[in-house]
Amino acid sequence: MSNNIGSFWNKWDLHIHSPYTNMNNRYNCGIDLFCQTVKDKDIKVIGLTNYFIIQENEYNEVVAELGNDVYVIPNIEFRTNDTNGSGEYINIHVLFNPDNISIKAINDTLARIRLNNIASATAVYCSYESINSIGFDKVTISVDSLIAQLKSDFNPSDYLIIGVPNGYGGFHPNSKPRSVELAKKLDELSHAMFGRKEDTEFFLSTDNGRAQL
């Protein structure tokens, strides 16, 4: 029997923090109400986002509460060592394939990465216990170290790197050579971008030697 339904259009939100977020927590509700709101908005796929680490209990609770209504992708947001023209630390996101790797495997890999402690000389690694001991706002990560560890432990189909060109922590460059070179580097590393309609012209531009994407 032929299927004449045609295309399905589903709503995705790949950058959504839960009440378990490690920083900037403005929620006044629990996971149950958070998940109900997601379902009420008819969102079919979410990128469950947290800074540096997603703990197993957060992911498992959200998945259990959403059930089969919503597909949940772990999205870890990293504040990098690099800064943009406004002096803000640049953020990048890594989305992990939950069908291929577990939250434990993700966290075991990240825990091997030494972070930059911007507050003191104390060694800190990318694990919840280590970061929480000094504060999530006190650490940044080397992009090169992150990428090297991901490539060492995972297959290309296990994760996607998402760049953030605009907004707080975005890498949209000014005219300074270092800013342009940094934007080119993040262009090349990123599999996709969290962007706006207005970003199209920027990413199609070949100004300042940037390769057309």
Predicted regions and their residues:
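Domain-core and long-helix interface of multi-subunit machines
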Residues: 1-30, 57, 112-213
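A metal-dependent hydrolase metal-coordination microenvironment
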Residues: 4-129, 133
